[in-house]
Amino acid sequence: MDPDYPDLDPESLDVLNSLQEGYDEEEEEDSGVSLNGMGDYHLKSALRSYTDMMKHPIFKKEFSKAVINFGISHDSMMSQIETMFYILKSTPLSMHLGTLYGDLFTRQSTLGHSEDVFDIIQAEIRTLHPHLLLEMTPAKVEEMVLIADRKTYDERAASAFWSTLITIKNYIPAWTEKGACTLDWPSVSLDKKSGYVKVMAGKDTTIYIGTDICVIEKYPTVKWAPLSYLLNGADKVAERLNVRYYSCLCDQLDIPDRITLDMLDEIIKVGDDCLREMGNDGYNVIGSYEALLAGIIQRRDNQGLIPDRDLLWRTTMEEFTSSPGRKYLEEWSTMFSSLSPEQIACAHGLYRIWGHPIVDILGGIKKMQEVASVKKNPRQSVLDEIRRQFKEMFFTSYHRIHKHYPLHTILNSLDNSYILNCLKDNLTINTSAISYNFQDWDCVMVEKNFEVPFSWNLVHNLKDKAISPNRQEIYQTISTRGTIFGSQNRRGILKSLTMETVQLRDFLQGINDNGLDDIDKIIGVYPKERELKIKARLFSLMSFRLRLYCVSTEALLGDKILKYFPQITMSLDMLTMIKKMFKVSSQTTREDDSVTVIFNLDFIKWNLQMRRNICEPVFSQLGKLFGMENLFNRTHETFRDSLIYLCSGEGVLSADPVYGVFPDGTWAWAGDESGKEGLRQKGWTILTVVTIMLIAKRHNVDVSLMGGGDNQVLGITISGVTRDLQGELITESASLARRTIKQFTEDLLTTFSDLGLPLKASETWVSDSLFMYNKHMFYKGIPLRSPLKAISRIFPLANDTIMTIDNMINNISSGVKAACMKERHGIPLVFMKTLAYRKVAEGALILHPLTTCFRTPTLPENGTVTRDGRKRSVKVTRNQLRSFFTLCMVGSSTMGLPGTIHLPDMIMRGFPDPLTSHLSFISELVPKIMDPRLASIIATSGHMSINRMTEYAKLVEDPVSINHDAPTHGLNEIRQLSRDFLMNTTLAANTHLKSLFTLLDRQREKEFYDALCSAEELDVKVLHEVAGASLFGYTNGIASRIDQTRTVRALNETVNVMKRLADAEARYIAYLFARDIHKHDLIPDQCSRVTADRYRYYSWKKKVLGVTVPHPIEMCQVTSATQTAFEDAVICWSDNLSGSRIYTTMGLGKIYQGSYTKERFKATDIAAAYGNEDILTKAVRLQKLINWRYDEGSSFARIIQLALRAITDASTDGFHRXKEEIKGEFDHRRGISGDISGGIPNFLVTPTSHXSCTTSSWISHSRGGKNENIHFQSVLINLLYRAMVYRGSLPGLPEMVWYSKERCSHCIIDIVEPSPERTTPALSEMPSAPNNPFAFIESVNVKLDYHHQVEIEKGMEETNLLNSEWGGSSLTSVDEAGLVLFLMLIGSRQVSESFLLLMREKIEPRPLLQAALNRVILVRKLGLDRLFPIRNTKCINLILGSDRGITACHDGFGLELHGGSWEKGIECDTSFLYNDTHLKPCKLHVNLHLQNVPLQLALAHASYNPDVCECLECRAIIEDRVSKRMVGQYKSWRCQYHAVLSFSPIIMRVHSERIIKSEGAIYEGDLHVPYVEEIIALENSQKLAIDVTSWRLPLLMHATWESILPQLYITMKACLVSLPLEGVIVDDDLALINLVSKVLVDLRRTIQVYIRAGTFSGSEINNKYDNIRLLPEDLRDSIHILTTTDKPDPAATVQLAADDTSPLDCAVYHLIWGDTWGMTRKVHGRILIPSSRVTTGFAGVMVTDYYATVAVLELAGAVNLWEKKLIDLEHRNNLDVPLSMNRVLAGSRLGTRGIRWAQWTSPAGLEIVVRKVRAKLSSISGNPGNAAKWRRNCQKVLKALMISLYAHSGEDMMRNASGLVKVNIHGTLSSVTAVCDPSAESRVQRAQFLFLKEKAPNGPFIXRSRLERRINLLSVVSDLLG
């Protein structure tokens, strides 16, 4: 577990590391040891020249031996390029026995059962892709594999040859010790004279390979290459094999937007040709490959927007103007210019496929010295601004997080300073306020706010990192040995073992005061590995204490400071990082009145440019925050005073008694204060980010920044632009944006130049489409597919670890999972990983990397298994080969088998139970296997036998484990050996550390774990935490950091130790052969969840609680349909897009990115403070379980407290919450420590935006129900993935609905709370070491950060206020829900949409809204609305989004609807929130668990005595207390006249969910429809007439629905009674749907109802299915979501009887509106339902006809016209749809999103419009942002109003309207055209244009082109609100 990310598992950390700067494939090199290649399978060091290598004594010695034995010379050495091409093109591949490849091939071909691979592949693919049943057969899979094998034969054979040779090379130490070769291959022998392995490669080719040199004899020539060149070439052939094989598979699978094999070969050939011609210099061209490809994508940007879209491409090409390399760049450019961005991105990851250059180490040193020698004189004005900007960012962010400002001192008090007044009164600083003066920050000085934790000591940053000897040590080494190499002085671990105890608090204080001792001021530099730069990029090794200083201070920044700079991504978890990349990249696709572009900044040697005077403005502030002003400023002083030397051995170094190494100016030098790679990344990043935000401030643009090190990507958003109807920027706006971008770019270059951190102008590029961050590419907001880089690095063998079969298969699994993250789906990866697993299994038998060191490869003869509690030796034969291979391809490490990964787990991260995952996968896989014998073998992999020993330590360390009979092997073996070494080591001179290591005693540890698991039932997740919090867990954590190190392994790994490991591995392989010969102890049930519980119960002999979770592939059945019906299932509704476009376009749905499960309550303030201490972290976190998992005072709670008492003398009181403050189920919310808790998709999630999912429809298991063992994230991921791949593979599909229904009735069970009587272990004490500073901390030594002090004081103050307990007061759920809703309205609390729906289901809407409204009004009456304005009203819409809510609140508050739909919810007129007459007498309570306690207290005062609101003195007192967030002495918050000392409101502390969820669901009863309550009144409904020849429309007042709905009720009822209707189509309008439902209920009829659903709402919930739940149960099955491709016949007809008296006989075509059915009942005819409608009313065209069938009635929203109108026959050819008489302007292009105007022709109607404007403006003013943004938003709303006025105005309407809203408009509206376009694609629009041209040439209008306007706000928003 990484201390920076304690909550992430290693797998997630691997992915996160690939995202973060400085972590991408970096490895440290340990001096010259890397050259001997011992145990290495891949290149890990930079490639050196012959001259540099000869400076290493080890290599020089080996070369001298090779000269004698083989006659080699410098001239016969192959370059690294020659070596690579020899491996790629000239590998001797003889198939004859007695040659290496022939021996290998012969042995592989005898193993057999290769056909099983094909069967397993097809079956695994079909587990999630059953639609591929006919395409994926074993024969088809075999055909595809054979094609891929044939096309990649050369690479496959060469890779196999060289990996075999390298593996044999690694046997040399063991074979030399043994004196013989253990391999019985005729082609391999040990040459005892030279010590080399002799390999017969071909008829005339012999290869001799040693630890450092490989000699190739092909008569008559002798060539040789250093081993590093060989490793480089072997890596490249393996990488090319992987990518070519994968591309070939993708070709056959027809993966869209792929790089085909032919394309790939062309790309690789260009690079190869370049290297052949240019040699090592060709890597300069190869190094430009990435920039070229990014430049090609950038060239596709909008030329009218981006000032120089060719910049990156052009500068890349110009760099090689006079170089032969240019032609190769041109070839690539031509090649890629015709490819899609997805294809380019995929090829982008191939930049290392051509190998690596020979580095110029001296050139790298000179370049480093050249940059470092530049004197920096940054402009003082820039430094001053940076200092101010740092304070602004830190103070505002600190206040946002903690609600108070950091400790500071005002140096010079200024009158009327906005900043100083805000700091004084603790008010939020708005940097856009008019009175904000940036220079006032000079008057503010930060004080100490953060402490260095006392328990930070030697072990806090203990890692296996190479270090430099100090000056004295290196002086002695050079003087005595003539070399700088000495392992004891170069490993940090050994230093830690031998050093005295160091408390970092004192250590850092000493550095702050006096600096570092001179003896420690030394830095070694070495060339970074696997780079493409010829001039070496140098990394640094520091002395132990210098490293301790740098690492500790960086850790302080990471732990304490970075959270206040959210722009920095270095400390973000994986999911947050991914979401932020999506957010920043997607801004480029916005089509509103703004435009966003992406800047990629490229600094020139960012680290080396840093100096003390550059960093001082930030570093001095950082130091002051820790009370040590010089702490960070010492960085560059220390660098300046340090001796810097080349530590990799190539330099000529001489000893110096002062410096350690004589500073000759070439290989060693001093006086260099420049920054060094990787030593102060976080500090320098903060400086860079502060400077960028300073520049952004000057240009008034919004900035989204992602920064880590020198990799800075920022999106700048320019507002105030105008777009045409196609969404493109008009010319003027494009010019404005170009100017802004150009000015911003120039300012970036100038400011950073003035600071001394120059940007590379030629590569600081801008794009409006391409976003790149750490190799992740997004194009127009969509992540690009790019799996090839990860594919290329899928290797079974890895450096620096023991190569067991389990490790090799895990390496494959990790690589495949990393590749899947960049891939669309896992189908081609199933091929890759299954074939790779088979190869590993073959290699383990033929040439095992470990066991062949000591024994000849043979099949095992006997294997040991356990049955019925007894060990049994089982004879094995070749007959078990098939079983062995199968276990290696489908096994699970949880079952004791090699850890393969299967498709259902490949596509997600975070599923908590690997046992049920494996068992359910096997149960799904077996039926799909074609071969019955193979199916039987696979089924047996799910069987288990029980170990005869019960080691509870294994269960506690891994709570999901089972006690199987597999033997220990591999890393488990070496882990214990290393612990034994540490316990007995004499190296540990530190007595405290040595004392800790005594806890590693096996027997003592076993006794502890046995006692911990002594209860009747095992609550194993809790036991895991208890053990982790104990000293056993703490010590094991330290040991795990040590025993994974190369250093300690080297101390252990003598040949004897390695032989023990090899023996363990041989036993394990024999076990795999023997495992399934005899019947197992336990076999699976039909349900995997039941099986897993049984396995755990019987293997551990006790019931294991809380870890078994059913997997969705067995628990749920996924089905699909093209018609939507209500189902008790998780539902996924797709849009109408299918085929490859779903991968390259963004839908309107919300992308599902998964989620981490968060705990629903926080630790106490004191627990949060103490949790900073290393020793206490786990024990303090454990205390949260009291009253959550176990009640306070219970026996188990006492053990939980005991864990804390064992390591501190602090009282355990105050470390846990009271029971009423806790919410959230433990089993769901608390993950196993170190693992992901939640679930994240592990594939490109773009296609999920084309679907809308909900779990609310799963009524049996939805929110508010029972606590069950369901992992909802995995259910959603499984459902979305299946739907996504199905739709992506089949173009032309209609919209579909996918259901994930419960399939297995046994999977889902209730989670039962544990009983302490059965789960409490018999544990009386925990290990404790009070006198050991590593293991115990006294409370007096715990110093709290300032914000913790404030929070604890505040918490104590609030605790003193408590006077009530939940259950002991009259508090109702309505009161509490009203408080929550109020806090949401003012933006103080965020609540999920699903919880709001739960509130809606449990609490009556009217009293709930009243409870919130009371508080809103009292805030206004107290004058606190300036501090707490209404910020967000979306919660109102969601709470009232039911027929009950609409009806109740319309009657109660006069609430008006702007609209309402099932998918998007309702949209209310929220102006009622500003009506003070709604206030009702009440007495408000206070909940200390919620936010804004001072405000709650103030409202309680006002509610108990309304006179307080009228008293100016009371209001002034209250405002002062609330603004300062005071809570003490709250009873005296009134003036003397109104003071009441007995004032005592209900004050409690309780989690709101406990109150709200305790309520039962509201009984819905009859269906409610607004305005349709009294049936009798309906017959008298007024019908409105209209003259369509005039544009004077009827007045639709606020009672619009009161007129319409009754008429629709009558119409609908009459139709159902009179006509044989088959179905009803209803617009997605909440009131109309409920009306139809009510009619059906009243008539007791069922009929198919089709709801015309719109586009996805993009919310986290799926509203329509929540609304289906509200319908009467017998109607649910009749409701269908109507999609655009699933309509009833548009020409559906209705049978009508003839009647000569019909008023419609005089015409053939009639325009019908909703109330005319009664008049047309006797007319022959049919109703034409338009295929595309422009009306918002129920309308159709009646065609009088004597041919008729059954009709479908269509009912739509917002009916405006109610009489029939005969249609002139001459228009009928253009009139296939009714005309729209709706004059509401389409204002979306004008920025009026969310506003719908009512129609009006009088001042009375205008008042409705104004009320809506007021509501919109109040929402804007409630969340204003900066002043400019607020002004722009107001102008948008008012602009839309003005346009509406202009179009509707008659006579003096414009003047009246202007006066009413106090807005003047100057200028004119120009280029205004009619709404209907004669050239439009839509026939409807063309028909309307003809009609309007004839009937109404002057209206209606919409702005189509540029809009010239000047809108002046003559009053503030509060005036507009009346």
UniProtKB/Swiss-Prot annotation:
It catalyses: RNA(n) + a ribonucleoside 5'-triphosphate = RNA(n+1) + diphosphate; a 5'-end (5'-triphosphoguanosine)-adenylyl-adenylyl-cytidylyl-adenosine in mRNA + 2 S-adenosyl-L-methionine = a 5'-end (N(7)-methyl 5'-triphosphoguanosine)-(2'-O-methyladenylyl)-adenylyl-cytidylyl-adenosine in mRNA + 2 S-adenosyl-L-homocysteine + H(+); a 5'-end (5'-triphosphoguanosine)-adenylyl-adenylyl-cytidylyl-adenosine in mRNA + S-adenosyl-L-methionine = a 5'-end (5'-triphosphoguanosine)-(2'-O-methyladenylyl)-adenylyl-cytidylyl-adenosine in mRNA + S-adenosyl-L-homocysteine + H(+); a 5'-end triphospho-adenylyl-adenylyl-cytidylyl-adenosine in mRNA + GDP + H(+) = a 5'-end (5'-triphosphoguanosine)-adenylyl-adenylyl-cytidylyl-adenosine in mRNA + diphosphate. InterPro entries: Mononeg_mRNAcap, Mononeg_RNA_pol_cat. It is found in: Virion; Host cytoplasm. Residues 595-781 form the RdRp catalytic domain. Its main location: virion. GO terms for molecular function: ATP binding; GTPase activity; mRNA 5'-cap (guanine-N7-)-methyltransferase activity; RNA-directed RNA polymerase activity. GO terms for cellular component: host cell cytoplasm; virion component. Pfam families: Mononeg_mRNAcap (PF14318), Mononeg_RNA_pol (PF00946). Keywords: ATP-binding, Host cytoplasm, Hydrolase, Methyltransferase, mRNA capping, mRNA processing, Multifunctional enzyme, Nucleotide-binding, Nucleotidyltransferase, RNA-directed RNA polymerase, S-adenosyl-L-methionine, Transferase, Viral RNA replication, Virion. Its EC number is 2.7.7.48, 3.6.1.-, 2.7.7.88, 2.1.1.375. May form homodimer. Interacts with the P protein. Belongs to the rhabdoviridae protein L family. RNA-directed RNA polymerase that catalyzes the transcription of viral mRNAs, their capping and polyadenylation. The template is composed of the viral RNA tightly encapsidated by the nucleoprotein (N). The viral polymerase binds to the genomic RNA at the 3' leader promoter, and transcribes subsequently all viral mRNAs with a decreasing efficiency. The first gene is the most transcribed, and the last the least transcribed. The viral phosphoprotein acts as a processivity factor. Capping is concomitant with initiation of mRNA transcription. RNA-directed RNA polymerase that catalyzes the replication of viral genomic RNA. The template is composed of the viral RNA tightly encapsidated by the nucleoprotein (N). The replicase mode is dependent on intracellular N protein concentration. In this mode, the polymerase replicates the whole viral genome without recognizing transcriptional signals, and the replicated genome is not caped or polyadenylated. This is RNA-directed RNA polymerase L. It comes from Maize mosaic virus (isolate Maize/United States/Reed/2005). The gene is L.
